[in-house]
Amino acid sequence: MLKDKPPIQSSLEFVSIDELVPKDHLLRKIDKVIDFNFIHDLVKDLYCADNGRPALDPTLLFKLLFIGYLYGVRSERQLIREVQVNVAYRWFLGLGLTDKVPDASTLSQNRRRRFNDSDVYQQIFDEIVLQAMRKRLVSGKVLYTDSTHLKANANKNKWVKGEAQSSSRDYLKALEEAVEEDRAQHGKKPLAPRSKEPQAREIKQSTTDPDSGYMVRDGKPKGFFYLDHRSVDGRCNIITDVHVTSGNVHDSVPYLSRLDRQRERFNFEVKAVGLDAGYFTAGICKGLEERDVYGVISYRRPTHKKGFFYKREYRYDNDRDLYLCPVDQALNYKTTDRQGYRHYQSNPRHCLTCEFKERCTSNAKGIKTVTRHVWEDSKERINQHRLSEPGKLIYKRRKETVERSFADAKQLHGYRHARFKGLEKVRAQCLMTAAAQNMKKIALLAA
């Protein structure tokens, strides 16, 4: 006989909140292996010690934020509603079943006023990495770096023309010295001093989020984005660096400085790195060789005008410092420009009567120009690494490390969109997401 079940919402029971949380719950594992006590000492200088109302425990506050990043809860109001009804969340925060959950405005005001414009988020991220190192989950020997885009909270059609300073490479000073040395060796006059004022370029600037950048890349959506330049350690896929820029900054611009930052902050002895084709620049190749790092960088076929010879068909003669065209005519050195490129030009008397002129140059005067960077030798040596057996093994792991890290962040941690407006706030989001991913990885491996 079918009977109606009596309501039990008003019944009283004696229960232990610890018994209600499954033994294999992720938050149990995180609580077991991650020490959160450092947060209190880290932020105590941001609080008044002897005045004002009692503050919300900062450790509880950041653990609350971590729950949101671990489970991809984008809204702080929704996060508070989830904590109110989720026993595991309450247990992780040290709250009883009847304890009052902090108000959403308390959470947001602390984030906006107390911790904004501070390095608290960076220090928290660094400490989680250090805890992973103490558990031998990070080697610092092989690093994988890439970038991914986060859609800015901005309408791509709401913009005005603006100006931005050209991004300066980490190796600009070294390049200037190399150019002057190369020109001197070829008997050329020194170039006029570079303007101290960085060159401005015209950009699309969002009226909603001016810090974001309008991104235009092959195979990528167009619009206003931020870029997360992330490095992952090859041992257990622990994220070791997060650097956020606007979406119109090239991947190669901050790379060397971020590599140096990891070596200094965590005392990494980096032996090898795996990078995609966006990092295959002469400056990065030279920088890796100077740091004695085995660089494995993907190759991207250069753009080629249909019907013309490929650049590889022009052979460089190092002994004579000239190029030979497909019919063995010499292209001699002419100059070295400020960007570090040597220019080699053909003799128009040979080109104008050559049967392959139409496949060689469209120059009206019959002059073919081929450029070669002053650090091209470094590029050629680094390029050979990807063809070696160790290089193939290193590059093969990119999809298992940094690419998997981004996929996990986008699929499970709400990483497709920027939650906030402004570079500093988006940087905080990226650091907290990466720290949450690291905590999960540590918990699954070490618990």
PLM segments and residue spans:
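Hydrophobic alpha-helical membrane-insertion signals
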Residues: M1-R28
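Anion-binding and metal-coordination hotspots
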Residues: K3-D4, G72-V85, L95-A447
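Short, solvent-exposed coil/turn linker segments
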Residues: S16, I34-F38, G94, K161, ...
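A general alpha-helix detector
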Residues: S16, L60-F66, T106, E127
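Basic, short loop/linker segments at the boundary and entry of helix-turn-helix/winged-helix-like folds
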Residues: K23-F66, S378
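Short alpha-helix boundary/capping elements
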Residues: F38, Y69-G72, V87-W91
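N-terminal catalytic cores of NTP/NDP-binding nucleotidyl/phosphoryl-transfer enzymes
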Residues: T59-R74, L79
